[in-house]
Amino acid sequence: MYSTSTVKTRQGVELFLHRWQAGKPLARIALLHGLAEHAQRYDAFAQRLNAAGIELIAVDLRGHGRSSGERVWIDRFDDYLLDADVLVEVAETSAPAGVPLFLMGHSMGGTIAALYVAERAAKRKLAGLILSSAALKPGRDVPRWQLALGKIIGAIRPRFPALTIDPALLSRASGVVEANRRDPLVHHDAIPARTGAQLLAGMTRIEAKRASIALPLFVFHGTADKLTEPDGSRDFEAATSSTDSTLLMLEGSFHETLNDLDRDRVIRALIDWTLVRANLQRSRM
């Protein structure tokens, strides 16, 4: 069953929540979407999870989808961590006790999720971290001077239109690309320089703190991703202190592996991984 609601952050930002409920959930996943998109795009994925007994709860980040806030704008990356905290708190309190909760992030949502686990998850009871095509490292082809210039522009001209996302790079499935282009809730205009600079700052913080992450970890990425760096996922998985980590690299897949030609493979792997860890956690309760 699908339902929506709203909740306000301590800053007064109204966030739009999506919940796909399973009848008797075996596990819950709290999802953080990527830059310039929104959580409703995960409906097909959520239905697959529900069929396996996994509940999905997701939030439109501030400035995205149906949430309030200036479009795709943040003053500091910690603003997104506040949104993540609201999502996790709602997920913890809105389902039956004893159902393990996993935090998942796609693309920039993966940056948020990883940093949240590294810096703030001690007060939460998370059963694992799932990262989909996470933005964890600048692209290998991006010159250092361009990164430095982006930070400067983000400071002195924060709303400068810095970059756009080409929908053709999301998936090899043409229907996915066209649906994205027609979606009025997707932000199709340029991303402000401040938002881009803060995303880079988030990556730097993760690199310094990733060794502290010890949760069970499932990381997957397409090798042909041109929007986020596949090596970022490889390096992150190798650098954490998790003793239960899985890395799945999908040969030839584009950025949205959940919507690409290999989606059945990755969704099945994600479901299997989640249910095994959920069963392990329940056995320890």
Positions of the model-derived regions?
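Short beta-strand/loop motif that positions the catalytic acidic residue
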Residues: 213, 219-221, 225
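N-terminal cap/lid segment of alpha/beta-hydrolase-fold proteins
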Residues: 1-22
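Conserved alpha/beta-hydrolase
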Residues: 46-70
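Catalytic active-site module of serine/aspartate enzymes centered on a nucleophile-bearing elbow/loop
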Residues: 244-285
